[in-house]
Amino acid sequence: AMTSIAQSKSYRGFVEGGYGAFVGSKTGSVLSLSTSHGKMFGPIFVGGGIGIEQAWVKNESYLEGYISESGWDSWIGRKTFKGINVPVFANIKGIWNNKKLSPTFEVKAGFDLGMAWGLMGEAGAGCRFDLGKTALATTVFTKGVYEPDNLVTDDAKYVEGWFTSLGLKVAWEF
């Protein structure tokens, strides 16, 4: 009989929600919901995932331009931008033991689609809590780095540069 990966003892899935605040030269915040699926190789999970994020970038500079009688003129404006991103990523998690409380780490690397097209990476460390027969919760403090090729806002303004966030995520494991 064929066994699907979801029926395999080494299969793991995660659903996680989180909040992060941008730090450094960017200010704002991001709410996220994602899912990862893959296999356990001993204490290491290897898989991939997809998510959805709502981001707000406050008082961001942007370049505005227009053609005047004297030629091309431009100026720097400031505005709060918001938009949806869809991160697609590879995911590695380490779980040290299977006790009621276990230290854990995770690394994600991939690509953001949506408002900010570009590379994304995230690293985190936290604790995994055994809540009974099938429920396992993980709380992870994360640092995310995003490098959009061009962040295009709803009104076609462009924002460039690196975004760094610090956050907290809570996951349910199955």
Question: What is each model feature region?
Answer:
Residues 53-65, 69-72, 102, 118-174:
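Predominantly the C-terminal beta-signal and adjacent terminal strand-loop region
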Residues 60, 65-110:
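Helix-adjacent hinge/juxtasegments
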Residues 38-42, 93-97, 112-114, 126-132, ...:
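Structural signature of outer-membrane beta-barrel channels/translocons
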Residues 9-11, 27-31, 82-88, 101-103, ...:
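Residues that define the transmembrane beta-barrel architecture of outer-membrane proteins
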Residues 13-21, 35, 48-52, 90, ...:
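Transmembrane beta-barrel strands of outer-membrane/channel proteins
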Residues 20-22, 74-79, 108-113, 152-158:
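Extracellular loop and loop/strand-boundary signature of outer-membrane beta-barrel proteins
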Residues 5-11, 27, 97-103, 130-137:
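Short loop/turn motifs that connect adjacent beta-strands in outer-membrane beta-barrel proteins
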Residues 4-41, 45, 169, 173:
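Short glycine/proline- and aromatic-enriched beta-strand/turn motifs that initiate or cap beta-hairpins
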